[in-house]
Amino acid sequence: MRRFVILGHKVPTSGEFTLNDLPGTAGRIDVLCRAVGAALFVSHGIRTNTEVVLLVQDAVQIRIAGDRVKRLNPDERSTAAILQLALRGAAAEEVETTPGVVAAQASLSQVLDRLYQIEAHPIVLHEHGDPVDQFSFPENPAFILSDHLDFTDADEATLADLPRISLGSMALHTSQCITILHYLLDRDEGDTSADLVLCHKVWGEPKARLITGLLEDFGIPSNLMSHAVPSLYPGMLDGLGEVRIMVRPRDLERARAIIGDYFEQPVDE
């Protein structure tokens, strides 16, 4: 499951605002509505593998489950109406205010506690984070983003120990970041079924594992394939056969450069 946690800093927690002025009296709830759309909508459908968590003023949590939500439409006004109902209905315990939308009083720390309980992996989106192309996404990622404002000092303190990634030096809208993250995750899922290509050949599994460990440090997954020339087959029994390091096609150039910088010139066929 993918999750996107968006912190809204100005939306009235009471839900008392007019749908005719989303950027104004609604505290830029239009930013949250666009984030919901980017996270959940695909052409003619909903991403059922995605959950959106909106945290309003560190006080109210709204969860929207892609596999359960109903009556969600692409326009911001109708999405704002759903969020308004959630804000008005939020209580100490979780309440389903519309199908697939659950609201409750909660703080950022409580949101993180829930993520850990369901074995999600929180990751902060930040302009000064590590480059995303050097990051290996874990299973069940939960990306934490801010709205049109920077994280507050209190937010930063709560998120201080979490990994941070950046999508580049240019500041992007929250919804744009979500679209890019979906693309990267979709691409990675496609790569799981793609053919791996030969990156390097070494003699002996211990050395191969040193190299694959280095590649993993750079966010490049790899597989090992043992290969023995028939006349040398007994050597495989002692772990001394030829071992091939296989990577995804899109990682090949960078992986070979890393091996060349830290070990030796890569050997291919």
Give the role of each language-model region:
Residues 104-107, 125-133, 141-151:
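Long, charge-patterned amphipathic alpha-helical coiled-coil/hairpin "stalk" segments used as oligomerization
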Residues 150-158, 228-233:
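Short, glycine/polar-rich helix-capping loops at beta-to-alpha or helix-loop-helix junctions
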Residues 116, 160, 216:
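Anion (oxyanion) recognition and catalysis
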Residues 153-191:
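Structured adenosyl-cofactor binding patch, chiefly the S-adenosyl-L-methionine
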Residues 1-126:
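RNA substrate-binding interface of SAM-dependent RNA methyltransferases
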Residues 122, 164, 222:
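Hydrophobic anchor at the start of a short beta-strand
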Residues 191-269:
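Acidic/polar low-complexity segments and flexible, solvent-exposed patches
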